[in-house]
Amino acid sequence: MLHMHIRDENGRHSLDVEGYREAERVVRAAVGQEMVIQITSEAAGIYKAPAQIAAIEALQPEAVSIGLREIDQPDIGEAGVGRFLNGLARNHVMVQVILYDEKDLLRWQDLRQRGVVQDAQWFLLFVLGRYSVGQKSSPRDLLPFLNHHQGAEPWAVCAFGAAENTCIATAAAFGGHARVGFENNLLCKDGSTAPDNTALVLQAVHTAQALGRPLATAADVRQQFGGR
């Protein structure tokens, strides 16, 4: 799965619909269906919830990551959050719900238990150490999520800094998945600067294989998360 951001002509984060469509076209031309393309709906201090929702509803992408706290806003309301997420699921958009701490996870579980967010093939992302000193992650940051995760949703982690690979190993050992790469970290596990994004991905691959975790194909991902 490729996690995709785009930027405008000034290098700023963008949710431009046509920009995303062009980026998806270029990637598809290169890899065909052998990769799942997950776009971001991230606010990045630029967009508000209505604009984020409008962009994703217009795009109807193959997959998207959505920060729960970014869309769970008073001007959207619980009903609006439910309509948005449930609508994506009905259209077989693979939705990864980003949770920054255990409070986000508890809020997600509350929305699920009360039926605001309906049953679907949701995928959770636990963000480790987002608000730690120096934004450096530790495997210990996973424990509050594991202690509170009561649902059946599969989950992944992302982490910051040189301990990224250790966090990935911890997640893999507990049955989780991982988002890895330059978005959150530039360092290899030995503390050296990674020469490219591939180096970080390969670290994660070798770690998973050492723990007996097989690598998913694009077809595997689409089947597990209800893709089209």
What feature does the model see in each segment?
Residues 202, 206-228:
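Mid-to-C-terminal alpha-helical segments outside catalytic/metal-binding sites
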Residues 63-183, 193-195, 199:
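Catalytic alpha/beta core domains of metabolic enzymes, predominantly
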